[in-house]
Regions:
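Surface-exposed or flexible loop/turn and strand-edge residues in extracellular/cell-surface modules
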Residues: 1, 6, 13, 19, ...
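Low-complexity, small-hydrophobic/phenylalanine-enriched stretches
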Residues: 4, 9-37, 84, 131, ...
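Extracellular/surface-exposed low-complexity repeats and stalk/linker segments enriched in Gly/Pro
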Residues: 21-54, 68-74
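A detector of repeated loop/turn-to-beta-strand junctions in beta-rich toroidal repeat architectures
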Residues: 56, 81, 94-97, 109, ...
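Short beta-strand segments and strand-loop junctions that repeat across beta-rich extracellular domains
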Residues: 57-65
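Short loop/turn segments that connect beta-strands within beta-propeller blades
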Residues: 65, 102-106, 148-152, 192-196, ...
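Conserved short beta-strand element of beta-propeller blades
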Residues: 75-88, 115-137, 161-181, 205-229, ...
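A short beta-strand motif characteristic of beta-propeller blades
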Residues: 109-114, 154-160, 197-206, 250-258, ...
């Protein structure tokens, strides 16, 4: 460690120039500051640098090899939070279980409570404090449950979907949740998240293809919701459709996936500007591909990276910074308990995050606050 002792300063009419820089505790006294939608890479970040993420309205500081979010919460969106909630399963032993984990810190899931009835291959969305599960249950295929994300315990009945729906997908802007399905000509229904009650008809997914056979990938920002994955007859298609969440109407064409993917639940995760989609089955093969789109800009998806292994039946959610995919079914290793993650604004392959309580697939996932 260097020590500076100053007795006298002469020629103080100009600033002292430290040619090798001046650091305190390894951090430059004068830090760089960047405003951008993407994580800055040049100049190479050093300890103490600040980055204002204009896409998510989050302030970061570079510490210990990475940018860390500053403030009470890293969540900048009204529809998610730092606590992931994963519910249901295709296994009767745990098809009512809700489990949770902290998205900001890698680790394993713990028990949260139980759904009101068995469920699989439904979908979830919320408003940052409440998460609603649109269930596909053996006993009922149009029911919805809800939980308060910060309070461990069992789910309560919310109401019913406007139709009996199989293999749903849900989007949210923080006040309204819209749920769609391949059934009833691609019917969609919506609810106000902070109340309880039955869903109201929203419109239909506008496609001649079957939508989301065994689950669709959905994403959203504060205005738009996207639905991806379909079948054209018995073959995989690559369609993405979108809606304006506050405007009840049929969907419109958004673009296409980078590869055809259709059934057995590939899943999306979103922040305020970007939706990432991973897993699924296409042309008879399990996929490990991750695609991404800018949610507010129509066009085709771009390759993001790969999941840790090719999977179907995955579920996913995010905290507006980190996307997590949970469980899934591998064609040779069967159901998995793995949780894997990516940083939504940084393209690349997924990494291991932790484990679910048990191996499972065809679950539902959402997120909300932890306090």
């Amino acid at each position: 460690m260097s020590t500076i002792k100053v007795d006298t300063i002469r020629n103080y009419d100009s600033a002292v120039d430290f040619s090798q820089g001046f650091k305190v505790g390894g951090a430059d006294v004068i830090q760089n500051y960047t405003e951008s939608a993407d994580m800055p890479e040049t100049p190479t970040p050093v300890n103490g640098d600040y980055w204002w993420d204009t896409a998510n309205n989050v302030l970061y500081r570079y510490m210990d090899g990475g940018f860390r979010a500053l403030g009470i919460s890293s969540n900048a969106n009204a529809w998610n939070g730092v606590r992931a909630l994963v519910a249901g399963s295709n296994f009767s032993a745990n098809d009512t279980v809700i489990q949770y984990f902290d998205i900001t810190s890698a680790g394993n899931a713990a028990d949260f409570g139980d759904l009101t009835a068995d469920a699989k291959l439904g979908s979830a969305a919320g408003n940052g404090s409440r998460v609603i599960f649109a269930k596909i249950a053996i006993s009922s295929s149009n029911s919805m449950d809800y939980v308060t994300s910060s309070t461990l315990g069992n789910a309560q009945d919310f109401g019913d979907l406007n139709y009996s729906m199989d293999y749903t997908g849900s989007v949210s802007d923080g006040s309204r949740k819209v749920t769609g399905s391949k059934d009833n000509s691609g019917a969609m229904g919506y609810v106000a998240i902070d109340t309880t009650g039955n869903a109201t008809s929203f419109g239909n997914l506008s496609t001649s293809n079957w939508w989301g056979y065994n689950g669709m990938a959905c994403g959203n920002d504060g205005t738009y919701g996207t639905f991806a994955g379909s079948l054209n007859g018995s073959s995989a298609a690559n369609e993405i459709q979108y809606i304006t969440i506050q405007t009840a109407a049929n969907s419109s064409n958004f673009g296409g996936l980078s590869q055809t993917r259709d059934f057995y639940a590939f899943q999306s995760c979103s922040d305020a500007t970007r939706t990432v989609m991973g897993g699924g089955v296409g042309q008879g093969s399990h996929r490990n591909n991750i695609d991404y789109i800018t949610t507010a800009t129509t066009g085709n998806a771009t390759d993001f990276g790969d999941l840790t292994q090719a999977m179907r039946g995955v579920t996913g959610t995010s905290n507006a910074i980190t996307a997590v995919w949970c469980g899934g079914y591998h064609e040779t290793n069967y159901s998995q308990n793995v949780i894997q993650s990516v940083t939504i604004q940084t393209t690349g392959n997924a990494t291991d995050f932790g484990d679910l309580l048990t191996a499972a697939n065809e679950q539902m996932a959402g997120s909300g606050s932890a306090s």
